[in-house]
Amino acid sequence: VKTKAGSATKNIVEMNDGTVHGNLYGAALTDAASTGNADANEMTINGGTVSGTVYGSHNAGAGDAKGNTITIKGGSLHGIYGGFAAGTGVTTGNTVNLGDGEHSLAAGTTINGTIYGGNKANDADNTLNVNTNATAGNIANFDKLKFTLKDSTLNPANSVLRLTTGATNNLDWTKLDVDATGLTVTPKSYEAYRVNLMDNANGVSFTKGATNTYASSGAKQRTNGDLEYVIDTDNHTANAAQYVYFEALQFQNKQNAEFAAADGTKNEAWGGRTKVGNGVKNNTLTVTGGTLTQAAYGGLAENFTRDSAGNLNTAGNATENKLVLNAGANTLNAYGAQVRTKGGSAAENTVLLSGGTVTGSLYGGALTDAGATGSATANEITVKGGTVTGDVYGGFTNGSGATTGNIVNLGDGDHSLSTGTNIAGTIYGGNKADVTGNTLNVNTNATAGNIQNFGKLQFNLNSNALTQSTPMLRLSASGGTNNLDWRTLDVNAEKFNAPIKTYEAYNLVLMENIN
C-alpha cells in the first residue's frame, strides 16, 4: 500500500510452491510517510522457496505492525518477522507457528535465519508456537514460548526446536509453557521420558533485560495422575548450557518397575521418582540383572523448584516404597528410598535382598542432604541372600533428624539364608545415637561385620532355619560389639522343635564376636 493515511489489515497470503526472488509480505505499507497500521494479517507457507525475508507485515511508516500470524508448514526460508515497523510503531501481539499442530513440517523444510516476533524490543504478547520438530538459526523478540507435544507431530529422538546461530537470549521463563495432553509417555526404570524442547549449543538465557526470570520458580511442573511433567534447563539455572527439556516421571503407584540383564549398564534405576517435590509413594523396583554404577532406589525424591526468593524448595517425602534385589543384581548402593530434599522424610520404605551384589551400602531409607531436617523412620530391610560389601542402615540421615523405629531382618523367619550370603560391614538400626525402636531380628544363622545402634535384639528360633553348630549371629570385624541393652535382648522359641536329649541341654550360641 502506497498511501500516507491507509492501513493494511486482515489480508491473507498462502504460499504453496514456487520461488519468491525477494521478500514475502503478508501486508506492506511502503510509504515512509505513512501513518497507518499493518495489523492482523495472516500468512501460511506450505512449501516453496523465499530467497529474501518473510514478513507477517511490514510498515515503512510511523504506524504499527502488530497482531499478525505466520504459520510455517514447509518451505525453504531465511529470516522471518511476525511484524516489522520501520518508524515509531509497535510490533506486538504477533504470532509465529512452526507447524499447524496436526502434522510434522514438510520434508526438507529449512529456516536458515532468525525468527523474530517483531523487530522492536517491546515484544509484549509476541508468541512462538512450536508444534513440531523444527530447526532455525535463532529466535528473538518473543514474549511467550509454547510447545505443543503430540504423538502425531513429534519425533522425541530429536530436539523440538534446534537453534544453530549464536546464543538465544532475553527469554522469559515465566512465559514458557508446554501442552503435553496429546503425548503418550512411558518412563523407564532407569531414565525419564525426555524431550529436549530447545537445543542451542551456544546457550539459552532466561534473563529478560536485567531480570533473572528463572530464579523465582526454578523447574516448572505439571501433574497428571501418577505422572509429573518437569520443564527445566540442563543446569537448573537461568542460563542453560544447551538444553531446555521436558521430562515425564512417575512418582507414585509404580509397582512393576524392573531392571534386568537386557538393560545393560546404567547409572541408576528407580521405582518412583520426583524432581519437583511430589510425594514419592507406593513404588516397587525389582532388579534381576544388569549393572547399576550408582544406585538402585525403590523411591527417589528431589526438588528443583524454587520459592519467590529464588531458594530451592525443601518439600519431598518418600514413603512406602520397596526395592527388591534378586540373583543377578549388581549395584553400587541400594535404597528402599533416598530423599535429597532438605525438608523431606523417608518412612516405611522396605528393601528385600534375596540375591545379587551390593558393592557399596544398603539403606532402608536415607536422607542425603547435609542440611536435612526430616527423619528416616520405620523403614525395614530383610536379607534372604546376596552380599553387601559395605554397611547396612535401616535408617540414615546426613542431617539433624531421627533414625528411629527401623527394622533389619536377617532371614525371613522360615528359611535359612542362601548359600554365600554375607554382610561384610556393620548393620546399623540407624546412624544416629537415638536407637528408640530400632530392632534387629535374627531369624537364622547369619554373619556380618558388626551391629550398632539397635534398641532391641530379637532372636527368633525356627528349627527349619537353624544350624545348632553355628552361632546364629557371627560378627567378624575387628573391635567389639558395644552399647547393647541386655534388658531388650529377647528370644522367641515358638517355632523351635528340636529334640532335647535326656542327658544334656540344647546349647545354641545366639551371638559371637571373638573381639
Located regions from the model:
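Short, solvent-exposed linear patches
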Residues: 6-9, 36-39, 63-66, 89-93, ...
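Extracellular beta-strand/loop-rich repeat segments of large surface/secreted proteins
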Residues: 89, 103, 108-192, 399-404, ...
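Short, polar loop/linker segments at the starts of domains and inter-domain junctions
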Residues: 37-38, 90-96, 157-163, 267-270, ...
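Outer-membrane translocation/initiation segment of Type V secreted surface proteins
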Residues: 194, 199-263, 496-515
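Feature marks extracellular polysaccharide-active and adherence modules
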Residues: 2-4, 14-16, 21-31, 44-46, ...
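N-terminal segments that cap or nucleate solenoid repeat domains
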Residues: 1-8, 12-15, 20-24, 236-296, ...
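Intrinsically disordered, low-complexity segments used as extracellular stalks/linkers
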Residues: 4, 10, 25, 42-45, ...
